[in-house]
Structures are given as structure tokens and as C-alpha cells.
Amino acid sequence: QRQMCIRDSNGPILTIRKFPNQPITIQTLIEIGSITREAAEFLKSLVIAGYNIFISGGTGSGKTTFLNALSCFIPETERLITVEDSAELQIQGIANLVRLEAREANLEGKNAVSIRDLLRSALRMRPDRIILGEVRDAAACELLTAMNTGHDGSLSTGHANSPQDMLNRLETLVLMGMDIPLEAVRSQIASAIDIVVQLGRLRDRSRKVLTIAEVAGMQEGHIVLRDIFQFQERGEAEDGTVVGNLQWTGAKLSQTTKLELAGVKVPCG
């Protein structure tokens, strides 16, 4: 669990964020209606094949929970390195697991270890995959470098309201750490990230996968996104529950090389 204590005008405020003793699995997410079985099988195939997947969503949308669920599909023989600001991930079933955690500076302002430092170190540790708990600063540069230098199957999360917003935010974060042309940044992002999964918290407080989009390269200087799955709302039940489900749009994946090399097929897309 994580705690945060801060004082406001009325006195101290303590916020406690508790995690379940056992990680929530993809099967649980299917049962509660957060994702359909078809979409879950689709993502399972992509994780096994080594697609780089970014999970996007607002605060409290379930990004860390979903990242944990997807990590269960990583082959247990692979070497996995996780990088986090504070340890939240509950990775299970991976024997060769290295967990790196950032550290703030001491009272003298020394001995800080940043996410960027840890990502640079992770690249020297021969990982098969890297999981970054959340990208929120110029560490996005190192993450894209990892994804573009043979570390397929990497996963991360970020705060954004749509797949396009997530890519736009990544552009901004990269430019915070590198002085390069915007088109070069977009090219790096387009070649690094394969899939963006958008999560959302609906008005009935349920958490859903809203979109699964493929990053389908560049066109006229802009990154192309193609929706493979999209949540379709059909109204509300009498108790106010949002009625709808995640549906395949009929679009096919344009980038299938990783699937072919891994000998993996997807149920759709």
C-alpha cells in the first residue's frame, strides 16, 4: 500500500492506497465486464509476440491493475526488468525478475536515483522486456530508446484521455529531454509503440477498456492510429449501470511481422 499525508487548511489529510493481496487477473476483468474475452485473447497474443503496448487512462482508471493483468502473459522464461517511481506492480510467474525503484535525494540533496538513471541501467542488464510503471517526464526518451533497440514486448502506462492524447503527451515529454525536430520525435514514437490501450472510468464508476488502437506508422508527418476495438455504449440499466461492450471495429492489424515470427495468431484484428 501507499500513504500520502498532507496538511490543508482544516488539518492533516491522510490518503491510503491499498492493493489487493492477490493481483487481479485478466479473467477477473472479463468477469466484471472491463474487457471482453475476444479483446483479452487479442491482447494476450500481442504480449506473447512481443508487441510494445502503452496503457493510457485518467487517474483511477485502473492502469496499474491492467498492466499487472497483461504481464501474466509474458513467457516465464524471459528476463524482465521493472522500473517504478514507487513499487506498485505485482508481477508473478517470472523467475528472472529484476525490480528497480527510484529514490529521492537525501536531506543533503544527494544520492537521488531517477527513473532515467534506472532505465539506462536496465538497458545494460540484458533484459528481454522492460516494464516502466508510468511515464511522466523526460524518461520517455529512454523508454523509446529501449523499445527501438530490440527490447520488444515492453509495457508502460501514462495519463491521457485518448490514444491520440497519449501520443501527443509523449511528444511533449520527449522534447523535455531532447532537442530534436518534432517530426523525428514522432518517427521514434511510431516505430517504438505498437498498441495503445485506452482505459476509462465511466459515470457509473465502472472501469472499462474503451479503445485498443494500433500505431500504424506515419503519414504526412503525423502518427496514424487505427482503432481495432472500441467500446460501444447502448444506454443505461434501471440502476444506472452503463450498458455496452468492447467491439471489434473490423480493422485488421497492419503490422504483423512480430506475430509471424513468434508463430502466434490473433482471434481477430
Where are these regions (language model features)?
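Short, small-residue-biased leader/transition segments that mark boundaries at the very start
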Residues: 1-6
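Glycine-rich adenosyl-nucleotide cofactor-binding module
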Residues: 10-56
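Well-ordered alpha-helical segments embedded in enzymatic catalytic cores
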Residues: 38-42, 114-118, 139-142
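Walker A (P-loop) phosphate-binding loop of P-loop NTPases
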Residues: 60
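Conserved P-loop NTPase nucleotide-binding/switch module
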Residues: 84, 90-98, 122-220
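NTP-binding/hydrolysis catalytic cores, primarily Walker-type P-loop NTPases
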Residues: 205-269
